[in-house]
Amino acid sequence: MKTLIKNGTLVTAESSFQADLLIEGEHIIQIAPSIEAADAEVVDASGQLVLPGGIDAHVHINLPMGETVSSDDYYTGSKAAAFGGTTTIIDFVSQDAGSLAENIARKHAEAESKAAIDYSLHMNITRFDESVAEELPDLPSLGIHSIKVFTAYNNRLRLGDGEIFKVMRIAGRHGLLTMVHAENGDVIDVLTAEALAQGHTSPIWHARTRPGWGEVEASLRAVALAAQAEAPVYIVHMNMAGEVDQLVYGRAHDVPAMGETCPQYLFFSEKDLERQDGAKWVCSPPLRSPADQDGLWRGIETGTIQVLATDHCPFFYDGTKPILYEGELVSIPGKELGKDNFTRIPNGLPGVGDR
């Protein structure tokens, strides 16, 4: 089956130009100023931009969180991505019971029958021991080339600095990229306990108990650990201008340090958490200031931040209202869980449908 896209403006990484594009199966076979193909379905793209399908390198599909689960599965989530022009998503495998290989197999079983587009996977490493150390080198053979560690979420997801160093060192030796969720888990725990004790329960306290300096410090720590492990590092969902500075510093000292930010950190601020519907805007790390937005934009302009992803992780604002899913009415608890306590608000925003 051939498809001929005519009269469009083709956009590549380097330039944009008027041309026709001929596709056969899943491959582009010709780009030229004018193409004729009698056996092709013709799509007239006059006045339209023709872009490659997007890759969203950071999504969470069907993610359990606290008392609920995110509000899409691989069918609804991947369909939303396709409508937005994204044709590949990269989700995360949770490190649950069993081996890493078993966790990966379970994730594929969840995704393969429902995904409407291409997908790939990162592997979370939230528990480290000798068996995990032995398994890490095998991940590329299982199609996994990136792993993620956390410096926050104490007693749940966080690894200690020594464990992160060991993980990075193994990763660097075996062609794996280490992604880091960079916040200071100890400071968050102290400030959260104090806020609740003082009766602070509204959504804005999600940001106030996760100070921006925590992300800056944890990002520098991640870069420093990567330098000592002689391994590449990728800071996910950067939200602080100061994090951009840490990448610049690391690269100036020959550390292969990369970074990602997301639309929510470029267009919204912590002021949105003060709105009546502030729970909608709760994500981790939290939204920051307009000055941080400016710093992130500069990071994009200079190439310090190389990746724009979404950290897609949607929850219903009011999960008490049932929806029709696979022929049945179901209710999935959502942001209303935290109406009296900001720590119970599911952390996450939608985004995979936007590009």
Specify the residue positions occupied by each region the protein language model found.
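Metal-associated gating/positioning segment near the N- to mid-region
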Residues: 46-114, 131
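His/Asp/Glu-enriched, well-ordered alpha-helical/loop segment
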Residues: 201-230, 301-302, 307-308, 313-355
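Divalent metal-coordination and catalytic microenvironments
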Residues: 8, 26, 47, 58, ...
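Short catalytic-loop micro-motif centered on adjacent basic/acidic residues
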Residues: 89-91, 120-123, 232-237
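Histidine-rich, glycine-flanked metal-binding segment
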Residues: 1-4, 9-52
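Alpha-helix-loop-beta-strand connector modules within alpha/beta enzyme cores
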Residues: 101-117, 165-180
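Histidine/acidic residue-rich metal-binding segments in metalloenzymes
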Residues: 134-308
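Short acidic/polar active-site loop segments enriched in Thr and Asp
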Residues: 86-88, 117, 145, 306
